[in-house]
């Protein structure tokens, strides 16, 4: 789960991370009053959307008067902001964060993430802040600093000293950086986060370190322990189909292709998407129905796939282990009769009760195209939509 910048800063402040401060606006009629409450010489108006690249897209504006701030805020609120992360459709700006500006002497990058490949927690830092870490990695990879933390032993003093040293901090600034590392680590662990990113972390004119922008992503599986964080969820920032799928216990991610996929198991789902690409088409989604899906969940999965107007065909690829193929077949038939599937539907079944499942589909009277293996299924669905 993602949250907005102002929410991320609120959490980090609770853990002792110094951040820039401001006020959030959720209604246009509150803009003027909110800006009047800020007593500052420089105003920073920031669009609050769950995507990076806001600055380059015009979603962050720095102005030097209240009147300018009010005009910029009114112009920005409600626009469709298009960044390199939103896609061409953009994201509507329903919230603004208006901050007091500050002098910036130097910008840094600092984050903490789970490194699944190394089975550890990793700090990533750089003396080049204010730009995407991917851009730093591409242009100046030697400027990226990494420190790994063993979850069994936790954060140690040498981690904090090492990060401060590698970033070039000395004396009081080194002490500040050590405290920030400790605070961010504690926030990461205690909130079940998967990533905390501060970009940029700045040194201001007073020589103090300050988190000027912040992003936190949480592990959905840990949210039940954090109702206060769950309450920060902004459903307007999420794809409605993905939200609907999550509520039904389905793992769904919308993509840009035209072949809908329904699969059980994340690995099989990715293999299915790969082979669709191999045969010359593109998947419209990732959809894992899980190992314990029943008829109703299968029906809901197909309804979600067909809610995407770009879908021209559907490939169902099920390996029956825990899930029985006859249950899948009954769910497919129920969905087809209920919603009227009008696009080509290719079904590949294997595993538990596969012959019974195939028999149910064959006797259904519906126009379902059977496939005997994954390659056959991919070939048939691609040919069917041409």
UniProtKB/Swiss-Prot annotation:
Entries under SUPFAM superfamilies matching the protein: Glutathione synthetase ATP-binding domain-like, Succinyl-CoA synthetase domains
Annotated GO biological process: succinyl-CoA metabolic process; tricarboxylic acid cycle
Superkingdom of origin: Bacteria
Co-factor binding details: Binds 1 Mg(2+) ion per subunit.
Key words, A-Z: ATP-binding, Ligase, Magnesium, Metal-binding, Nucleotide-binding, Tricarboxylic acid cycle
Annotated GO MF terms: ATP binding; magnesium ion binding; succinate-CoA ligase (ADP-forming) activity; succinate-CoA ligase (GDP-forming) activity
Residues engaged in binding substrate: 264, 321-323
Annotated binding of Mg(2+), by residue: 199, 213
The keyword Magnesium is annotated on this UniProt entry: yes
Domain ATP-grasp: 9-244
Pfam families registered for this protein in UniProt: ATP-grasp_2 (PF08442), Ligase_CoA (PF00549)
Catalysed reactions, semicolon-separated: succinate + ATP + CoA = succinyl-CoA + ADP + phosphate; GTP + succinate + CoA = succinyl-CoA + GDP + phosphate
Residues reported to bind ATP: 46, 53-55, 99, 102, 107
EC number in record: 6.2.1.5
UniProt keyword Metal-binding, yes or no: yes
Biochemical pathway: Carbohydrate metabolism; tricarboxylic acid cycle; succinate from succinyl-CoA (ligase route): step 1/1
The protein's required cofactors: Mg(2+)
Assigned protein family: Belongs to the succinate/malate CoA ligase beta subunit family.
HAMAP family reported for this sequence: Succ_CoA_beta
Subunit structure, as described in the record: Heterotetramer of two alpha and two beta subunits.
Function, as annotated: Succinyl-CoA synthetase functions in the citric acid cycle (TCA), coupling the hydrolysis of succinyl-CoA to the synthesis of either ATP or GTP and thus represents the only step of substrate-level phosphorylation in the TCA. The beta subunit provides nucleotide specificity of the enzyme and binds the substrate succinate, while the binding sites for coenzyme A and phosphate are found in the alpha subunit.
Protein known as: Succinate--CoA ligase [ADP-forming] subunit beta
Organism for this UniProt entry: Rickettsia massiliae (strain Mtu5)
Phylogenetic placement of the source organism: Bacteria, Pseudomonadati, Pseudomonadota, Alphaproteobacteria, Rickettsiales
């Amino acid at each position: 789960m993602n949250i907005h910048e102002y929410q991320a800063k609120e959490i980090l402040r609770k853990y002792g991370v110094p951040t820039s401060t401001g006020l959030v606006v959720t209604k246009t009629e509150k803009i003027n009053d909110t800006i009047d409450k800020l007593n500052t010489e420089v105003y920073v108006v920031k669009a609050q959307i769950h995507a990076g690249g806001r600055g380059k897209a015009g979603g962050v504006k720095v102005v030097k008067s209240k009147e300018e701030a009010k005009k910029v805020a009114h112009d920005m609120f409600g626009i469709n902001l298009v960044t390199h992360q939103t896609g061409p459709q953009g994201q509507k700006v329903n919230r603004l964060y208006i901050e007091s500006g500050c002098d910036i002497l130097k910008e840094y990058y600092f984050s903490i993430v789970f490194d699944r490949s190394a089975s550890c927690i990793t700090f990533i830092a750089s003396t080049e802040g204010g730009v995407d870490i991917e851009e730093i990695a591409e242009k100046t990879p030697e400027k990226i600093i990494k420190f790994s933390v063993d979850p069994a032993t936790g954060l140690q003093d040498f981690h904090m000293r090492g990060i401060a040293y590698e970033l070039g901090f000395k004396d009081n600034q080194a002490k500040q950086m050590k405290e920030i590392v400790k605070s961010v680590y504690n926030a990461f662990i205690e909130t079940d986060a998967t990533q905390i990113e501060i970009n940029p972390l700045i040194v201001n004119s007073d020589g103090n370190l300050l988190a000027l922008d912040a992003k936190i992503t949480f592990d959905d599986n840990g949210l039940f322990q954090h109702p206060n964080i769950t309450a920060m969820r902004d459903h307007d920032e999420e794809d409605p189909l993905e939200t609907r799928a999550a509520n039904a216990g389905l793992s769904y991610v919308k993509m840009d292709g035209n072949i809908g996929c329904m699969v059980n198991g994340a690995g099989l789902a990715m293999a299915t998407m790969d082979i669709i690409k191999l045969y010359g088409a593109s998947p419209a989604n990732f959809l894992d129905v899980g190992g314990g899906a029943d008829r109703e969940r299968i029906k809901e999965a197909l309804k979600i796939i067909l809610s995407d107007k770009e879908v021209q065909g559907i490939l169902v690829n099920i390996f029956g282990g825990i899930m029985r193929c006859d249950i899948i077949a009954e769910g497919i038939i129920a969905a087809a009769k209920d919603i009227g599937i009008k696009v080509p539907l290719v079904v590949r079944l294997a595993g538990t009760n596969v012959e019974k499942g195939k028999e149910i589909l064959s006797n259904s009277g519906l126009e379902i195209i059977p496939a005997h293996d994954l390659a056959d299924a991919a070939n048939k669905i691609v040919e069917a939509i041409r």
